[in-house]
């Protein structure tokens, strides 16, 4: 028997749970639409990275296999098979929600169902807003098929010259920055591509439009960097980003159009060349023909529309922790260690702490890591202001996937302001979220530390669940300062800490040691691990052994889980759960009954434990330990948003009509009351 679930199929099962949220009839309609948007955006990234990676391994005949022993070709086929039915489910769900929205006055209307007055408005919109932005190409001997960047959205048409009756083909690129949903009247929306299609004869004069289809390509978007040759890492990353849009096509999505037109499009894609003059390989490309609009990720336009608040869940306002004194956060931290649970408890104290440090004349230095900070960052703004007055040292991780460009921008801005900026660490990705502020008061140095499971990003802090920790303890600050020094001196690979634990050297051995300790207590042992993913085979094997010793193990794994629970003789004492709700579960909390409870930036994956700089933080303060344990206990009682994984790899909702509990709703209502 295979001891592991396939990683890729486990991820797809997570995205299925996202799709299930779109099917939840108890949710407001735009909340359901939001989950369709998330589903599609997730799947885009899965194809850009995971499927593209498998395709590369298969084409280069790399002999490695998945954790379950499946070959690259087998995994690609399993992915295609898994999605074949689910894509249809997604389309049906969109159509159901679309019909319900129509009854509520939000109408996504096909162009051919518009009346004459509405079509006149659409024509005006085309002339004033779209005509100058679309890029039409007639494909002939002098105009070959142009290069297509990743996530290109376009129309492909068969056209006929009215004078010569010659048949030819045309490509019309639609820019990504236009509004996809055009509101012709209050509540009446038409897709931009349908307006363009209806006016193609204004782009191709003296031609008749015979056939037309919308299509979208997804390309390999992973960035391969040879760090051994990197003298200027920022420059190397900048050059690599320019190549991202030139990757091989891994997925083709089409809508409408005849089978003949689709065949011509496929032939055209095979023949056109990229800027590097390498032909696109369509071997193994996954192709999907849709009965609904392409790219449901654009549904965010409707979800965020200001006129339909009644169709959304009410906004939750995070609570400010009462222990934080607005005038002097540092005094609050000096009194006691504090732990916040975002988004239920506000992220504002984190931003305020940095802003206060930047303006405080007693501040000597600020050291912190930045992984994903977003496009508009009050934290970076405060660091830029501080850099002219005090020592500011920032490690900006340029390898944060899909945030590379934003991080490059902030790294350059910080450097211009006078901050010391480190662009990452050789062959390691710095994923630890840490901040240490050093002040001088009464002729003494005082250190204030902030550590977190989440990013220094106020926007994501409103939709991700994370814990963040504040301390004025010297032993914690000393470890973080030591870690910063190891990053600056490129010695992080072999560094160890005294009070905290860091990857790649310490976290995995520590977790194994903690599992082994619970094994010594056999049936009295108890482990709860909450993470985004469980993939590391060595950790999984130790959990199997612990189960066989009688240790009770509850795993709350939001996404990928390669461990097989409830298998007789292997994992009978292990139960695996996943919570998918309106907030993205992102905190990592690790509980061992006979030792301690920890929070961490690291998931239980080889990349986190072996190829990243991560932190594992013990909760030595009893109040904080109890707060972390309470979070786990409430989630294990969830009967509305919790799924359980069985030994066959299937997830089923945990329900109890007599005791309904949505853990995320509970935390909203109880914020600051029980914590």
Describe the predicted segments one by one.
Residues 1-527, 545-549, 561-585, 589-675:
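N-terminal localization/anchoring segments of enzymes in phospholipid and broader phosphate metabolism
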Residues 537:
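Active-site glycine- and acidic-residue-rich loops that bind
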Residues 552-556:
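Hydrophobic alpha/beta core scaffold segments
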């Amino acid at each position: 028997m295979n001891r592991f679930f396939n990683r890729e199929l486990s991820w797809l099962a997570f995205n299925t749970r996202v799709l299930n949220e779109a099917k939840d009839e108890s949710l407001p309609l735009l909340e359901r639409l939001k989950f369709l948007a998330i589903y599609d955006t997730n799947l885009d990234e899965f194809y850009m990275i995971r499927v593209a990676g498998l395709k590369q391994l298969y084409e280069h005949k790399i002999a490695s296999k998945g954790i379950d022993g499946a070959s690259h070709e087998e995994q690609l086929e399993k992915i295609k098979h898994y999605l074949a039915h689910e894509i249809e489910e997604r389309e049906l769900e969109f159509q159901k929600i679309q019909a319900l929205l129509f009854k509520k006055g939000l109408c996504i209307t096909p162009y051919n169902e518009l009346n004459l007055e509405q079509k006149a408005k659409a024509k005006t919109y085309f002339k004033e807003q779209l005509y100058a932005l679309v890029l039409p190409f007639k494909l002939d001997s002098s105009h070959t098929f142009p290069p297509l960047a990743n996530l290109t959205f376009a129309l492909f048409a068969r056209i006929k010259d009215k004078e010569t009756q010659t048949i030819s083909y045309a490509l019309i690129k639609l820019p990504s920055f236009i509004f996809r949903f055009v509101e012709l009247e209050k509540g009446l929306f038409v897709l931009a591509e349908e307006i363009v299609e209806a006016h193609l004869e204004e782009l191709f004069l003296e031609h008749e439009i015979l056939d037309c289809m919308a299509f979208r390509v997804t390309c390999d978007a992973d960035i391969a960097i040879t760090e051994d040759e990197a003298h200027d890492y920022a420059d190397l990353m900048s050059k690599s980003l320019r190549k991202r849009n030139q990757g091989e096509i891994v997925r083709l999505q089409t809508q409408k159009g005849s089978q003949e037109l689709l065949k011509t499009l496929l032939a055209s894609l095979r023949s056109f060349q990229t800027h590097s003059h390498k032909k696109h390989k369509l071997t193994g490309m996954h192709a999907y023909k849709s009965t609904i609009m392409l790219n449901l990720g654009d549904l965010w336009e409707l979800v965020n529309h200001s006129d339909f608040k009644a169709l959304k869940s009410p906004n939750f306002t995070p609570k400010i922790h009462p222990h934080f004194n607005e005038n002097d956060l540092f005094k609050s931290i000096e009194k006691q260690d504090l732990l916040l649970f975002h988004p239920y408890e506000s992220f504002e104290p984190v931003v305020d702490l940095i802003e206060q440090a930047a303006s405080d004349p007693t501040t000597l230095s600020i050291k912190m890591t930045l992984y994903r900070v977003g496009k508009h960052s009050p934290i970076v703004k405060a660091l830029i202001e501080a850099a002219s007055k005090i020592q500011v040292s920032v490690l900006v991780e340029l390898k944060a996937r899909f945030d590379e460009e934003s991080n490059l921008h902030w790294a350059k801005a910080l450097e211009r302001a006078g901050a010391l900026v480190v662009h990452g660490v050789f062959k390691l990705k710095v994923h630890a979220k840490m901040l240490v502020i050093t002040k001088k008061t009464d002729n003494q140095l005082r250190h204030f530390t902030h550590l977190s499971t989440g990013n220094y990003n106020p926007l994501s802090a409103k939709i991700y669940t994370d814990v963040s920790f504040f301390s004025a303890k010297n032993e914690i600050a000393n470890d973080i300062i030591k870690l910063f020094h190891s990053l600056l001196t490129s010695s992080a690979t072999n560094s160890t800490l005294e009070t905290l634990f860091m990857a790649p050297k310490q976290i995995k051995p520590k977790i194994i040691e903690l599992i082994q300790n619970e094994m010594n207590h056999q049936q009295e042992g108890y482990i709860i691990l909450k993470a985004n993913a469980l993939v590391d085979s060595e950790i999984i094997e130790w959990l199997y052994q612990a189960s066989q010793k009688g240790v009770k193990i509850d795993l709350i794994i939001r996404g990928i889980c390669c461990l097989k629970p409830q298998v007789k003789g292997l994992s009978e004492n292990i139960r695996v759960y996943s919570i998918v709700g309106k907030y993205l579960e992102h905190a990592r909390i690790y509980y061992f009954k006979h030792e301690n409870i920890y929070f961490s930036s690291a998931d239980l994956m080889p990349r986190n434990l072996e190829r990243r700089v991560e932190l594992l933080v013990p909760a030595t303060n009893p109040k904080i330990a109890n707060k972390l344990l309470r979070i786990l206990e409430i989630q294990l009682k969830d009967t509305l948003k919790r799924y359980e994984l069985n030994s066959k790899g299937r997830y089923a909702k945990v329900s109890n009509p007599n005791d309904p509990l949505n853990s995320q709703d509970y935390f909203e209502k109880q914020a600051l009351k029980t914590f």
